[in-house]
């Protein structure tokens, strides 16, 4: 994800982030299935999706911590 996209994600609501996270997890599942069957055209996409999942989880956790501290 680009820095601009990350800033937009930080402005999103937790529900939107959770929805995006679920979509990315489903995409990762499909990519792994394609990899196993030898149909995956772009193996780097797996890495990109994993990184996006980690970034969204980090943003969600930061918001949890921020809410707890207040």
UniProtKB/Swiss-Prot annotation:
It holds the Pfam family Ribosomal_L29. The keyword Ribonucleoprotein applies. One of its GO terms (cellular component) is cytosolic large ribosomal subunit. One of its GO terms (molecular function) is structural constituent of ribosome. InterPro entries: Ribosomal_protein_uL29, Ribosomal_uL29, Ribosomal_uL29_CS, Ribosomal_uL29_sf. Keywords: Ribonucleoprotein, Ribosomal protein. GO terms for biological process: translation. The keyword Membrane does not apply. Belongs to the universal ribosomal protein uL29 family. NCBIfam families: L29. This is Large ribosomal subunit protein uL29. It comes from Clostridium botulinum (strain Hall / ATCC 3502 / NCTC 13319 / Type A). The lineage of its organism: Bacteria, Bacillati, Bacillota, Clostridia, Eubacteriales.
């Amino acid at each position: 994800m680009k820095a601009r996209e990350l800033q937009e994600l930080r402005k999103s609501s937790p529900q939107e982030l959770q929805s995006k996270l679920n979509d990315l997890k489903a995409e990762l599942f499909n990519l792994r299935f394609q990899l196993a069957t030898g149909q995956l055209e772009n193996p780097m996409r797996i890495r990109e999706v994993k990184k996006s999942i980690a970034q969204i989880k980090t943003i969600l956790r930061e918001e949890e911590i921020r809410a707890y501290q207040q």
